[in-house]
């Protein structure tokens, strides 16, 4: 006798598959960090400091942007920064706010980009201050730390760590203290699949699909207030 699965059962199966996939993906990244030597070559912060004039206008001279719409680059891991700069340069990642600096970015070599990444990575990030809203904080913390299995939303800690500092070897970005408006726009861009540059974009697209606008705001608020 064959049992035909209902739509509800199929959805539950899909949720389990997504959770297992993300869990295995995260475990593999964690294992790589623990057992495999890094082959990533660090850039030269001193050389990078002479190449950031066009970056500083929006991201700040020390990588701490004033506007919430622009991400803080200070303290971000080099691998992530380098990859994003390369995506912008190649056109794989498109953002209207970055369009004005593309001519300059296109004139830089990969070593220049690495040096810029090294400079910003060496800077100290300023702490963020989460909005003092008990419900918003509770929702954000629960999603960040535990996810929501019923909605197929895995915990953010799997890739971004409990303290929000990410995973440098894997290239998972630090989200702690990041600008709130930027986090909101980024999660929405992944949810709409507008942002699709890089191998890991598929993971972020999948985990953000079932996030509501309120949950995105809650997550962004919680991550903005994270610091060690």
Predicted segments, located by residue:
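N-terminal secretory signal peptides that target proteins for export/translocation
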Residues: 1-13
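Sec-dependent signal peptide recognition
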Residues: 12-20
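N-terminal signal peptide c-region/cleavage motif recognized by signal peptidases
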Residues: 26-28
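Electrostatic cytochrome c docking/interface patches
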Residues: 30-52, 69, 122-149
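The feature marks the first
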Residues: 35-92
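Sequence context surrounding c-type heme c attachment/ligation sites in exported
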Residues: 46-56, 78, 82, 146-157, ...
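The canonical Cys-X-X-Cys-His
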Residues: 48, 55-61, 116, 153-162, ...
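Axial heme c-ligation environment in periplasmic c-type cytochrome domains
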Residues: 66-72, 88-132, 169-174, 192-218, ...
